[in-house]
């Protein structure tokens, strides 16, 4: 098998001396010989399971030399542990492979936590707990066909905020039947919950009581995410439940994960206008503009927040340019006023000199001035021929 499906195999529980063919009647419902030493662990059907040291043949080993090869065949099993049956002189019980390599366990755990982020931590933790017994734990859905269920003894409870701690599995399997198991309600103090990851859409839910429902035909079990102490000897086997199996698409969070993608207009800090009429504030204005970018970038706002910051920078730059232009125009006006003042003084001096020259000139010289056609303020022309 590949992916999250389990490998199927069988386990030899006892060996008898008599031999019966594979097709003999009553081969599948014969009882298990009770000649076993020590208190063995219990199977779901109540029959004792011998310790690993009493097995006649290893799980994946080869049959004895004198046994026919047709006695062993691969059988596809439904979910749950099968009934003991006879194969010749072998009494066998179908079990599931739960061997998981330790190096790949961490990577598989991280992959499942990332893949099941939309369904919340509750279903993932319940699947991890019940997988220690090799039981499939898809997410419970309304309207799902219910198969035969088995009894589960509730785990021991301990006082305090952590109301339950699982040690070495969920409980001990008892006789078959159709039932559900409910543990007593939690104490008044709420249990400590694991904080949901950044990608989880559903937060962990706190239930007033723990309901565990295990079905051999593909039912579901759900537990709230309580803190657990797992035994080191227990090997977990996890199974991903596709949305097509459960008939319900897992809810997703429409909001993005990064908090920087949200923008609150009330968090934008608009700096006051640092410009004034005096020219001494221009240097401090330039320095404040250099510090604006660091001030706006320190906020967590992005997207529209950065656009508002850019608009503020543009407005401040335009105000700065306008103030510098006003300063330059004022300086040019002052320079032009000085030049006009100098020219006016020079013009007054020339008019005064011209008046003095007219007063000192002879009548003949004054008579030649209009005939020459020269302007009055121009330089003196050479004397023309007398009339």
From Swiss-Prot:
Residues 1-85, 135-232, 368-387 are annotated as: Disordered. Induction: Induced by TGF-beta treatment. Induced by a wasting-associated liver metabolism as a result of a methionine-choline deficient diet or cancer-induced cachectic phenotype. Induced by renal hyperosmotic stress. SUPFAM superfamilies: Delta-sleep-inducing peptide immunoreactive peptide (SSF58026). Expressed in the liver (at protein level). Expressed in Purkinje cells and proliferating cerebellar granular neurons (at protein level). Expressed in the cortex, medulla and papilla of the kidney. InterPro entries: TSC22/Bun, TSC22/BUN_CS, TSC22D4. The modification Phosphothreonine is found at residues 57, 183, 223. GO terms for biological process: glucose homeostasis; negative regulation of transcription by RNA polymerase II; neuron cellular homeostasis; neuron projection extension; response to osmotic stress. Belongs to the TSC-22/Dip/Bun family. This is TSC22 domain family protein 4. It comes from Mus musculus (Mouse). The gene is Tsc22d4.
């Amino acid at each position: 098998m590949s992916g999250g499906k389990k490998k199927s195999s069988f386990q030899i529980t006892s060996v008898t001396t008599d031999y019966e063919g594979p097709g003999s009647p009553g081969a599948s419902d014969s009882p298990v010989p009770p000649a076993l030493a020590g208190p063995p662990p219990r199977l779901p059907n109540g029959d004792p399971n011998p310790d690993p040291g009493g097995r006649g043949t290893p799980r994946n080993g080869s049959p004895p030399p004198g046994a026919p090869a047709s006695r062993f065949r691969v059988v596809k099993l439904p979910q749950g542990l099968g009934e003991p049956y006879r194969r010749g002189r072998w009494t066998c019980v179908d079990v599931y492979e739960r061997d998981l390599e330790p190096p790949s366990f961490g990577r598989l755990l991280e992959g499942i936590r990332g893949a099941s982020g939309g369904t919340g931590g509750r279903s993932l933790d319940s699947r991890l707990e019940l997988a220690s017994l090799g039981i499939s734990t898809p997410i419970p859905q309304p309207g799902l066909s219910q198969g035969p269920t088995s009894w589960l003894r509730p785990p021991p409870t301990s006082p305090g905020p952590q109301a339950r701690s699982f040690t070495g599995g969920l409980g001990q399997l008892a006789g078959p039947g159709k039932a559900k198991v409910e543990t007593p309600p939690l104490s008044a103090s709420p249990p400590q919950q694991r904080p949901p990851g950044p990608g989880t859409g559903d937060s962990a839910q706190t239930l007033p009581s723990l309901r565990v429902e295990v079905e051999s035909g593909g039912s579901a079990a759900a537990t709230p995410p309580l803190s657990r102490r797992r035994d080191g000897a227990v090997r977990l086997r996890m199974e991903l439940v596709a949305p097509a199996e459960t008939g319900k698409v897992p809810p997703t969070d429409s909001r993005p994960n990064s908090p920087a993608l949200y923008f609150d207009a009330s968090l934008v800090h608009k700096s006051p206008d640092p410009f004034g009429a005096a020219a001494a504030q221009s240097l401090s204005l330039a320095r404040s503009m250099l510090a604006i970018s660091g001030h706006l970038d320190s906020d967590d706002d992005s997207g529209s927040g950065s656009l508002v910051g850019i608009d503020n920078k543009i407005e401040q730059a335009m105000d700065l340019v306008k103030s510098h232009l006003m300063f330059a125009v004022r300086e040019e006006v002052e320079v032009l006023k000085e030049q006009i003042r100098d020219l006016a003084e020079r013009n007054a001096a020339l008019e005064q000199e011209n008046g003095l020259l007219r007063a000192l000139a002879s009548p003949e010289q004054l008579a030649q001035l209009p005939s020459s056609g020269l302007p009055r303020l121009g330089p003196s022309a050479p004397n023309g021929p007398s009339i």
